[in-house]
């Protein structure tokens, strides 16, 4: 009887966890008062456009843009965006590579005096931009590579409405074939990274 009770309890826990999976995969932080660096992952139209909006909102921020064959950076330049505020990398083949590249860029390009001391009320703040369903995996990776008392990162996914999604789109992720596919894919990728020690 005790074994049956344990099994039923575990099944209920797993079932509840799966029901909440979509919400868990899509964390988001509120916009901070300031941002020093905006990091855009795997550039696509919605991510680049939202990042550009944030760059206009935070005029002192720098933009670290992961682009493919410099496609979006050329469009930005064509539209007269101030490219002195943008650093482009087009060599990354994975999200993990992008996080590592951003961490390397910070280490190589930001003078130590520009990064406030530990415990400062205004830490060097990094806004991480991607699609909503990528954010939990990015959070794990950023915790591994951007976890420093002198740095603060915030998760700023492209707002759901820009994709014509709603909060319930991911809350009820099993109702839509595409959302089901990306939800399961992200869950598997997170598990893979954890199991292989990448995080």
What function would you assign to each model-found segment?
Residues 174-199:
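A transmembrane-helix-recognition feature enriched in membrane-embedded lipid enzymes
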Residues 23-174:
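A structural signal for short, hydrophobic/glycine-enriched beta-strand patches
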Residues 18, 22-23, 192:
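Membrane-water interface at transmembrane helix exits
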Residues 2-20:
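Hydrophobic membrane-insertion alpha-helices, especially the h-region
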């Amino acid at each position: 009887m005790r074994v049956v009770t344990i099994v039923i309890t575990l099944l209920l826990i797993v079932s509840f966890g799966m029901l909440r999976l979509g919400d868990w995969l899509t964390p988001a932080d509120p916009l901070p008062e300031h941002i020093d660096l905006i990091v855009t992952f795997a550039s696509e139209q919605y991510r680049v456009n939202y990042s550009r909006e944030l760059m206009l909102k935070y005029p002192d921020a720098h933009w670290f843009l992961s682009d493919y064959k410099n496609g979006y950076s050329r469009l930005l330049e064509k539209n007269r965006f101030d490219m002195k505020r943008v650093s482009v990398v087009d060599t990354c083949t994975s999200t993990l590579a992008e996080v590592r590249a951003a961490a390397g860029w910070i280490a190589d390009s930001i003078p130590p005096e520009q990064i406030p001391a530990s415990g400062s009320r205004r830490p060097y703040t990094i806004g991480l931009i991607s699609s909503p369903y990528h954010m939990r995996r990015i959070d794990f990776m950023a915790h591994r590579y951007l976890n420093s008392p002198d740095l603060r990162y915030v998760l700023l996914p492209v707002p759901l409405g820009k994709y014509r999604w709603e909060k319930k789109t991911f809350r009820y992720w099993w109702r839509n074939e595409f959302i089901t596919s990306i939800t399961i894919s992200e869950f598997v990728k997170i598990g893979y990274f954890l199991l292989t020690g990448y995080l």
